[in-house]
């Protein structure tokens, strides 16, 4: 590097950290510092590193790029002659296809980043990588860096982008404590990609935070390590990081989409869910997919015939069970042209449509004249009461259908104006949506379970479950098993 556009600015920022260089600033705190000093987030990250590691600006950027030297070489190996035991020659296949036109996506930078991400994974299976949270997130990091190096960005900007990747990666490296692509290739990769692309496209530090939240959200609770022992599956995980990061960046930069969640909250939640969910989800992954794991022929020669026979039987059993599970779903599905449900206002057929239909069933049983209401919702639904309580109340008090926008908007005010007692309570049991209605003559109750598409499962009711199911069918509400 010969010309340094940002050197003076970043050197002046070192003073922000010099009194307490090892202070553990969170990512959101660094974003706030960057905004306060009119600096890029990568500038603040570089200044902090200079204060902590006692490097000059030039040496820091050299060290940052040097940290990816091996991984970039691995990328080249995967792109040219590498062959993975799980991904085959996917990278060189794409390199060939790219000669005739962009193989994966029309955006040249993103297409290159995705191709090089896969190339890095292929090379990883040949010679290994320097890991961050794991070798998984090193793939999108390396793929993105190589794509940026080939794009007409100055070397200094690429080095600063790489520093930002390392900073974000360092947090995920600590947060990843068990199996999980959500804290590695998919999640960490998406967050870092979003941050880098947002900054390079002229985004503010605040926009970087929003882009990261948007990119990270779909990745949470995706522990995939056992799953990727199945050939091919990892390909969409690690390239998905690039796609999600790009999408998060564009949404943050080009729209007024509200994103109220702090990025520290999002990463902390991702790490916590990662620890809690991975053991449960991984055991299910393994049950279904272990028969499809890649094997080593030489190792298999060491396994006894009875064990191999048992595993073949397990594979056949998994196929049978899976087909029966899908067959059960098919039996419950509607005719092709009746697949879609009734219009649901409020934003979610599960969070609003299903509870609203519960209210409609209760209204049908009560016959109108409601003088008291009690609603119990599982924690997930209770936390979304802003959107589902209006639906439940309009269904229960008016018998309104799920598409009645006017009733949805006026019912809570009507309840408050008329002074109808309404009790709302959370319950710990999953899926629960339960309602009691009281009239001058009787009390009715519908105890149901939340289902998507506006459906509901009725488990109990007053005067009877049978009458509730009959009422639902009369109203055209789909009762799920």
Task: Report the location of each language-model feature.
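A structural-propensity feature for long, helix-poor, extended segments
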Residues: 163-205, 210-211, 217-248
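Alpha-helical support elements that line or immediately flank enzyme active sites
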Residues: 97-103, 138-155, 195-202, 394-401
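Structural helix-adjacent loops and short alpha-helical linkers that scaffold large soluble proteins
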Residues: 152-160, 202-209, 254-263
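Catalytic-core signal marking the mid-to-C-terminal active-site face
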Residues: 1-71, 257-481
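Acidic-glycine-rich active-site phosphate/pyrophosphate-binding loop
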Residues: 106-123, 155-174, 218-224, 362-372
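Active-site cofactor/substrate anionic-group-binding motifs, chiefly glycine-
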Residues: 74-139, 152
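Glycine- and small hydrophobic-enriched segments that form the cores of compact globular domains
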Residues: 126-139, 144-162, 168-171, 176
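A short glycine/serine-rich beta->alpha loop
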Residues: 100-103, 123-135, 175-184, 229-235, ...
């Amino acid at each position: 590097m010969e010309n340094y556009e940002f050197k003076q600015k970043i050197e002046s920022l070192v003073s922000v950290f010099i009194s307490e260089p090892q202070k553990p600033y969170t990512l959101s705190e660094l974003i706030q510092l960057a905004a306060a000093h009119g600096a890029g987030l990568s500038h603040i990250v570089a200044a902090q590193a200079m204060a902590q590691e006692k490097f000059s600006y030039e040496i820091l950027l050299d060290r940052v790029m040097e940290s990816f030297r091996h991984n970039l070489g691995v990328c080249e190996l995967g792109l040219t002659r590498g062959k993975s035991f799980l991904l085959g020659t996917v990278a060189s296949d794409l390199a060939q296809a790219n000669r005739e036109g962009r193989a994966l996506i029309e955006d040249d930078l993103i297409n290159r980043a995705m191709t090089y991400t896969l190339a890095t994974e292929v090379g990883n299976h040949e010679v290994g990588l320097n890991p961050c949270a794991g070798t998984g997130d090193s793939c999108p990091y390396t793929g993105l860096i190589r794509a940026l190096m080939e794009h007409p960005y100055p070397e200094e900007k690429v080095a600063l982008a790489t520093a930002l990747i390392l900073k974000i990666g360092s947090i995920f490296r600590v947060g990843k404590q068990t199996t999980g692509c959500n804290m590695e290739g998919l999640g960490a990769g998406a967050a870092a990609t979003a941050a880098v692309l947002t900054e390079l496209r002229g985004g503010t530090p605040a926009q970087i935070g929003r882009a990261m939240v948007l990119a990270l959200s779909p990745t949470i609770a995706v522990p995939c390590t056992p799953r990727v022992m199945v050939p091919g599956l990892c390909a969409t995980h690690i390239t998905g990081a690039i796609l999600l990061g790009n999408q998060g960046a564009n949404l943050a930069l080009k729209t007024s989409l509200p994103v109220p969640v702090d990025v520290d909250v999002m990463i902390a939640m991702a790490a916590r869910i990662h620890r809690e969910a991975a053991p449960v989800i991984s055991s299910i992954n393994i049950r279904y997919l272990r028969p499809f794991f890649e094997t080593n022929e030489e190792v298999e020669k060491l396994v006894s015939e009875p064990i191999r026979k048992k595993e073949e039987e397990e594979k056949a059993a998994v196929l049978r069970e899976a087909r029966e599970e899908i067959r059960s779903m098919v039996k419950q599905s509607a005719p092709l042209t009746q697949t879609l449900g009734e219009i649901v206002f409020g934003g979610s057929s599960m969070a609003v449509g299903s509870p609203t239909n519960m209210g409609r069933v209760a209204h049908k049983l009560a016959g109108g004249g409601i003088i008291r209401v009690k609603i119990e919702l599982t924690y997930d639904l209770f936390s979304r009461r802003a959107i589902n309580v209006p639906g439940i109340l309009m269904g229960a008090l008016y018998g309104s259908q799920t598409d009645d926008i006017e009733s949805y908007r006026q019912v809570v005010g009507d309840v408050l104006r008329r002074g109808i007692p309404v009790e709302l309570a959370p319950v710990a049991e999953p899926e629960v949506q339960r309602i009691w209605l009281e009239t001058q003559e009787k009390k009715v109750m519908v105890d149901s379970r939340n289902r998507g598409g506006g459906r509901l499962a009725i488990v109990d009711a007053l005067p009877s479950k049978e009458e509730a199911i009959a009422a639902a069918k009369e109203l055209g509400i789909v009762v799920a098993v």
